[in-house]
Regions:
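Basic, Lys/Arg- and aromatic-enriched nucleic-acid-binding interface segment
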Residues: 2, 10-41
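Active-site/catalytic core of tyrosine-dependent DNA strand-transfer enzymes
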Residues: 80-118
Length: 175
């Protein structure tokens, strides 16, 4: 199997510092949504009012894959209590997120610097952070696979770059 670069997810402390460093509604919308949903940056940038199931508090994402390169694959992502008011507030006024993927990346980099995180932080690092946090909260790999929109479980496993401390802690809890 070819070498697969593994992005390092943020530690829980780094994720908390990043979330706490957000000062504006826009910053919280970006950081908290990425941390709580595992969306790809293109999916966040492309989010519109039509993607929200208001009654059931969830997002409907039409993502990568599908036949002939179309975005026909649909997945459903629940909105956490933390991001629901941000999404509701934003889309009560706006039809779209109103930011490009590059703008989201720049804003995230600025917040990471403000939070004194001394390594690269990108939307995809937050996607990995979401995946590790989901597993640590007890979400099954097949459920995580669906949340992330992966066709293959092996793709999802790439995201689970658990630290040695995580492995030891889980072993002690379960053994």
């Amino acid at each position: 199997m070819p070498y697969q670069y593994k992005r390092e997810p943020l530690t829980p402390d780094e994720a908390n510092r990043l979330a706490s460093a957000c000062e504006t509604h826009q910053e919280r919308l970006i950081v908290w949504t990425l941390l709580d949903t595992g969306l790809r940056v293109s999916e966040l940038a492309g989010l519109t009012r039509e993607h929200i199931d208001w009654q059931n508090h969830r997002l409907m994402i039409y993502g990568k894959g599908g036949i002939y390169g179309t975005k026909s694959k649909r997945r459903i992502i629940p909105l956490t209590d933390r991001i629901r008011p941000l999404i509701d507030g934003h889309f009560a006024i706006h039809d779209t997120i109103g930011m490009t993927p590059r703008t989201i990346q720049r804003i995230l980099k600025r917040i990471a610097n403000k939070a004194h995180i001394n390594r690269p932080v990108s939307p995809h690092v937050l996607r990995h952070t979401f995946a590790v946090a989901a597993v640590q909260k007890g979400i099954s790999l097949p459920a995580l696979q669906r949340l992330l929109g992966h066709d293959r479980l092996t793709t999802t496993e790439i995201y689970l770059n658990l630290s040695p401390e995580d492995v030891i802690r889980e072993f002690r809890e379960k053994w």
